[in-house]
Amino acid sequence: MVNLVIMRHGEAEPMSAKDSQRQLTVRGLHDVNQMALWLQQHYAAFDWVWASPYLRTRQTAELMLAKQAPFSQLEIVPELVPDGDAALFKSYFDARLSEKPDARVLLVSHMPLVSFLVEAFTLPGQAPVFNTAQLACIDYRPAQGGRLLERLSPQELALLSF
């Protein structure tokens, strides 16, 4: 059962003076919408949707919420910033999961943290590079660890949808 989806934000504007304020591009909005529709068709809705405080991750999470978790609220988690600590976040996640062990959670974050999160929740040495709007679906239990069940990018989804 997939209970954890780790997602990189959609394509954002080029680097600017204030990285945290970069917005999604038109392509980024489209890609995130496509990924949200795919998740809606393949997996149950999320109980919790968490994103970094950066604008592009909040925009991504809000689009995902609209399609995938209409009864959930977006929670901003400062530890999900690009240079966040995956091991520290995993400890936080495990503590929260103890409150609701069957919760389904979407995390929206950045490279390189999304790669390190996959590694922290699955197997050491398994830190895949993420394209924008790409997601990883994980079956995770704190006592047993996690299994990466699938990864999907907007580009791969387009090939499946031809």
Predicted regions and their residues:
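Active-site-proximal alpha-helix that buttresses catalytic centers in soluble enzyme cores
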Residues: V2-L80, G84, G125
